[in-house]
Amino acid sequence: MRNFEMLPTEENVFSTFCNNVLGRNEDVKYFYEMLMSYDFSASIAIDGRWGSGKTFFVHHVMLLIDAMNSNSNLDSEKRDKIISKVRMDDSIKTELTSMCVVYYDAWKNDNDNEPILSLIYEIASQLCISINSDWIDGKKKFCNLAGTILECLSKKNINNMIECLKSENPFEEIKKQRSIENRISEFFKMIPEERANKVVIFIDELDRCKPIFTIRLLEQIKHYINDDRVMFVFSVNIDELQHTIKKYYGNGFDACRYLDRFFFQRISLPPTNKTEFYEYMGLGSRYYVDIVTRRICDIYNMQYREMTRYCSQVRTAVYKITHSDVSRCIFPVEKGHILVINIIVPLLIALRNMDTSKYNNFVNGKDYEPLMTLFSDEDNCLEIFRYFLNDKDSSEEKEDKIKITKDEMLMKVYNAIFNNDKEYKSDVMIGGCEFDNKTKEFAIRCSNMMTSSADYSI
């Protein structure tokens, strides 16, 4: 079974950017230009729901920054391909100096007592790797200074503050401890201007960290790092981050204003271009199951991670049937199964993923609202609506025909599948489809990917 949910590996970041899978390349370009425009140490928060693709967005920005910096370690072929995917102004293309980047996964370092330690370590290690090898002496001094800072900030030296107060010259010792800020300032100044005129530090997953870690990291960054050449970009879910802050300070605490101390600007993560995404997932066709799947993604406002998981499950569950000649059936019971596979199964998978209580009510015959919502879009439901009609039925006023509304028809189909034992207690013919007391079980098994319809090789 293929996992469509990609990790932000170097290869995946490069391929998704070059193919513009999420449709955000233009947003990446504008964000890059925004970063270039700042002439002070700004902190920007990119706000997005969990699973919306924030990590991929910041990695795409980092990729473009590296491509635009001629002193980065990107090979020329990759650099040219990346730049060709965005329409850069000529004035920006010709700049000789640019930005260098650091990526810090806060959640991976969540167990650190002093967040600034792991942050300084990541800055030192990543910048030493990303800057070209001819700056050998500078690298050594840079890393040595980073080591000195880490030593000064370590728990051992912090505990030594107590010993300092007991020494013969306590003020001199405290003065040495407070030189950390100067050393950190020197640390960033050692990045030669011909290599990069700015350092952009991307901090990801902060909203998933323990409250104490989150607070300490924000406070320590503000306290220790104040250099006009250093910028911070936080990719977070602001709502979740505010909840984290309130867990530390209390529910009555104004977490929104507190975060304003650290974030100069807040930006909402641009939405994905779903058309590009559906093409990538193989859902861009006019097969009815693809239309239904796209519609369901829109109805439940699925984020990138939710869509990849959902679409992968639908493909595995039904594509062997829906995208082959097997779907051309002549017997009513077969037509009923094909209808279930194309419509009911994708809906069951979505409900189970998104809302367990709605799923339970739906399969237990208590709530047909999800089916009604699915067909509230008139354009996409006309064809299937006709499929349900008997010879004597019509969706319009016609002589010798019985008019039946869409809602009435959908209710009949829903009851035939999920309330068959209560409403009918026998086989039911609706249009060209036949449903019986085993249709519900068939639908649930298909949605669980545990029938012959499933294809685990997809």
Question: What residue ranges belong to the model's regions?
Answer:
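The catalytic "switch" region of P-loop NTPases
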Residues: 1-20, 24-28, 64, 171-174, ...
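Walker A/P-loop-proximal flanking segment of P-loop NTPase domains
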Residues: 1-91, 432-458
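Short hydrophobic/aromatic beta-strand immediately N-terminal to the Walker A/P-loop
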Residues: 43-47, 103, 202
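Catalytic acidic motif of RecA-like/P-loop NTPases
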Residues: 47, 51, 204-215, 222
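P-loop NTPase nucleotide-binding core
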Residues: 52-190, 424-427
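Conserved AAA+ ATPase small/helical "lid" subdomain
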Residues: 83, 135-155, 264-341
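Alpha-helical lid/collar subdomain of P-loop NTPases
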Residues: 316-400
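Charge-biased C-terminal accessory regions appended to nucleic-acid-, cytoskeletal NTPase
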Residues: 378-458
